[in-house]
Amino acid sequence: MASSIVSSMFLFLLLLLVFPHIDNVLGARMELRELGEINYADPLGFTRPIVPIHVPGFPPRRPTIPQLPPYRPRRCPFCYPPPPPKAFPKNSPSH
């Protein structure tokens, strides 16, 4: 019984902490919707696009990639069994 009281109190406190934030977000959305309907103009009268700063004379830095040695597969003596012996070898001594 004590655990249910503690869990319900925790849930209540969590709702108290979260609810004002949700209310602020919903209020901000409503304000943005109202401003969009009013067709609000910028007080300065223009908007300036953000342009990245480019310093001439410096080439862009290329990312450094570590150089790996070339991959050479090594022979594994236990991976493949030796071929079976031939039934009729070419250089067999004749009787």
Swiss-Prot record:
One of its GO terms (biological process) is response to light stimulus. Its main location: secreted. Disulfide bonds: none annotated. Expressed in leaves, flowers and stems, but not in roots. Induction: Accumulates upon infection by the phytopathogenic bacterium X.campestris pv. campestris (both compatible and incompatible strains Xcc168 and Xcc750, respectively), agent of black rot. Accumulates at higher levels in light than in darkness. Repressed by MIF1. Residues 1-27 form the signal peptide. Keywords: Cell wall, Secreted, Signal. GO terms for cellular component: extracellular region. It comes from the Eukaryota. It is found in: Secreted, Cell wall. Maybe involved in defense responses to X.campestris, but probably not a X.campestris pv. campestris race 750 (e.g. Xcc750) resistance gene; according to genetic data, linked to a locus influencing resistance to Xcc750. Absent in the susceptible ecotype cv. Oy-0. Only present in ecotypes resistant against X.campestris pv. campestris race 750 (e.g. Xcc750). This is Protein ECS1. It comes from Arabidopsis thaliana (Mouse-ear cress).
